[in-house]
Regions:
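Glycine-aromatic micro-motifs
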Residues: 1-108
Length: 108
């Protein structure tokens, strides 16, 4: 299995190309992906939660730099609203370990 420390699975507003470009300041490479065992929910913002038999369809942003991460963390309000966690997603090229933003326990 591949492990991409410079990759982020997205499932909400960051699915939109214009939003991604506005946040990181440049175009980024993406691939389609699925996260098994989580479902997408919405309160004030989109978030995902563990759920048996669920699947979240999204994308993986590839090749993120430390500056990209700084901007993304600020956008996602880490650590107040979200925290980064490692997950395994399914892509057309097989499984991939990457990061995802999960809600903090007291946010939802």
């Amino acid at each position: 299995m591949k492990h991409a420390r410079d990759a982020l699975f997205v499932y909400g507003s960051l699915l939109e190309e214009a939003t991604r470009e506005r946040i990181v300041g440049h175009r980024v490479a993406v691939i389609e992906a699925r996260l098994i065992g989580f479902e997408r929910r919405r309160a004030r913002y989109h978030y995902i939660a563990r759920a048996d038999g669920a699947e979240t369809v999204g994308m993986v942003i590839l090749g993120l730099t430390s500056e990209d991460w700084r901007r993304l963390d600020a956008y996602e309000e880490v650590p107040r609203l979200y925290t980064r966690a490692e997950v395994e997603v399914v892509t057309s090229g097989g499984p991939l370990r990457c990061w995802v933003y999960l809600p903090t326990p007291n946010w939802t």
